[in-house]
Regions:
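N-terminal amphipathic/basic-hydrophobic helices that include classical n-h-c signal peptides
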Residues: 1-17, 83
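NAD(P)+-binding Rossmann beta1-loop-alpha1 motif at the extreme N-terminus of oxidoreductases
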Residues: 10-73
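Conserved beta-strand segments of alpha/beta enzyme cores
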Residues: 43, 65, 106, 131, ...
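Rossmann-like NAD(P)-binding element
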Residues: 67-108, 113
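Rossmann-fold dinucleotide-binding core
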Residues: 113-193
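Helical "substrate-binding/catalytic lid" subdomain
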Residues: 184-285
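Short, basic/aromatic-enriched C-terminal tail that caps enzymatic domains
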Residues: 282-300
């Protein structure tokens, strides 16, 4: 007896909903975070009006979808990944486009800002119904085959950040109030980028004083781990120096005027501003640093 081919409705494929995200900021970090989310099935919206050709090309290469600013609110989470100096401006934009919505999407600030600045960001959303989450990115941009960076989130009582976790990002929720993630970022960046700044300052001082060759030899012999780290981190800093200026100022603000260490990071801000100008200009300092870092170990 022939058996008819009757389709079973239970065997049909179940459509799985994949979330939409919006990312404001299509720099090296923002576009790489977007690519990680997109590779895990998400759609990532972005706003590119007034951005440079390089930024637009980077966003399109990552697969981000350019939309008008109002359409950013169609996302389930809106992420801000911009230089610290732009964090408040982005908060203003998102607060404006979310105004009057019955259920606006949560806003996640992932910028390198001090807790006080994070509180100022949150204040822009008062009365709007927007849930504001405090985030911090520790590590470099996501790359294929590696799980990092780590994104710390505080103030996420409803675990809204789980959507990001489900789409391939490493999320660690902090048991602390809004500002805890920003504080963690300030402390970590103060150590990590502060170390790079300290090395830059001392190598340039050695170059001016005729001690560069001896300093490099001594570092190679007695502090080889420091020597290797500076040899990587200083050249890596050159294209980022302009962004680190505001971050150092945020760290100084985080420490406060009564902490003498705040002056260290005010000085670091000036140092990175000087480096940023050199990178875009004569590159005299860059050449000095590269010459020192390229010196082979010297036998004694």
């Amino acid at each position: 007896m022939a058996i008819s081919n009757i389709s079973n409705p239970m065997s049909s494929l179940i459509e799985v909903h994949m979330p939409n995200f919006a990312i404001i900021g299509s720099g090296a970090m923002g576009s790489a975070v977007a690519k990680r989310l997109i590779d895990h099935g998400a759609t990532v919206l972005t706003y590119l009006e007034g951005r440079s050709e390089q930024t637009i090309a980077r966003a399109k290469a990552a697969g981000m979808v350019p939309v008008g600013h109002q359409d950013l609110t169609k996302a389930e989470l809106i992420l801000s990944i911009v230089p610290p100096s732009e964090a408040i401006k982005v908060a203003d934009l998102v607060a404006d486009i979310s105004s009057g919505m019955p259920a606006p999407p949560p806003f996640v600030d992932l910028n390198a800002i001090a807790p006080k600045t994070m509180q100022a960001v949150a204040a822009h959303f008062e009365g709007s119904g927007v849930e504001v989450l405090d985030g911090a990115i520790i590590g470099g941009p996501p790359v294929p085959g590696k799980s990092g960076p780590t994104i710390y989130i505080s103030g996420d009582t409803a675990e809204q950040s789980r959507l990001l976790e489900d789409c391939g990002l490493r999320i660690r929720r902090l048991d602390g109030p809004l500002g805890a993630a920003s504080a963690l970022k300030m402390c970590y960046a103060g150590i990590n980028k502060g170390f790079t700044g300290l090395g830059t300052a001392m190598l340039l001082a050695a170059s001016r004083s005729g001690a560069a060759e001896s300093l490099k030899a001594e570092l190679s012999e007695s502090l080889p781990d420091v020597d290797r780290k500076l040899s990587r981190s200083i050249p890596d800093m050159y294209p980022k120096a302009y962004r680190w200026v505001a971050e150092m100022q945020e760290i100084a603000d985080f420490l406060g005027e009564n902490d003498p260490a705040a002056t260290i990071f005010s000085g670091m801000a000036d140092l990175f501003a000087r480096m940023a100008g050199d990178v875009e200009g004569s590159r005299v300092l860059v050449r000095q640093l590269d010459e020192i870092l390229a010196r082979p170990d010297i036998d004694r």
